[in-house]
A protein has these predicted regions:
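Aromatic/hydrophobic pocket-lining residues that form the small-molecule binding cavity
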Residues: 28, 60, 107
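A short glycine-/small-residue-rich loop at the edge of a beta-strand within enzyme catalytic domains
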Residues: 23-26, 54-58
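Substrate-binding cleft of secreted/luminal carbohydrate-active enzymes
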Residues: 33, 38-57, 66-67, 73-153
Length: 153
């Protein structure tokens, strides 16, 4: 952070940790809570909230709220979304395993939900090719999702 600011104070510095807070601390050994409560670490954080609303481990809305509530300084919240899951089963989601396959507007609902949070400043989509060069099997689902997303932008 300091090196970036010394080079150009206008450049924003941020990170994109996984969305599961427990994994960050206990498996990645990163102290995101400290970075979001003290100055001098980040300008923005883009947690990879690649979970659906019905995910059994990390439901989307609750996870976004947790990230927002951790911010005790001026860090901006940019929510990382996962269009690469659109049209597919999410085998790790428990009760929400078919949510991405049967959606149609899940990305739009995610953006609308995140906008309610105090520190929300935008969203990022992971992965470019899943949106602009999707596999033919999920192309109709992606197009439907993009139409829904454009309506809320």
């Amino acid at each position: 952070y300091t090196a970036v600011k010394q080079a150009d104070g206008e450049v924003l510095f941020g990170i994109s940790p996984q969305g599961n807070m427990d994994n960050n601390y206990n498996k990645q050994f990163i102290d995101v809570k400290k970075w979001l409560s003290e100055e001098g670490y980040l300008d923005y954080i883009c947690p990879q909230v690649y979970f659906g609303f019905k995910n059994s481990t990390c439901p989307y809305e609750q996870t976004v709220e947790e990230w927002n509530d951790l911010i005790k300084n001026k860090v901006q919240l940019v929510v990382g979304l996962s269009p690469y899951k659109v049209g597919l089963e999410d085998a790790y989601a428990g009760n929400g395993r078919w949510e991405w396959a049967n959606g149609g507007d899940i990305l739009a609902r995610m953006v609308e939900t995140a906008r309610k949070e105090k520190h929300y400043q935008g969203f990022a989509l992971f992965r470019y090719n899943s949106v602009f060069q999707p596999e033919s099997s999920v192309r109709p689902a992606i197009l439907e999702e993009l139409d829904s997303l454009q309506e809320v932008l």
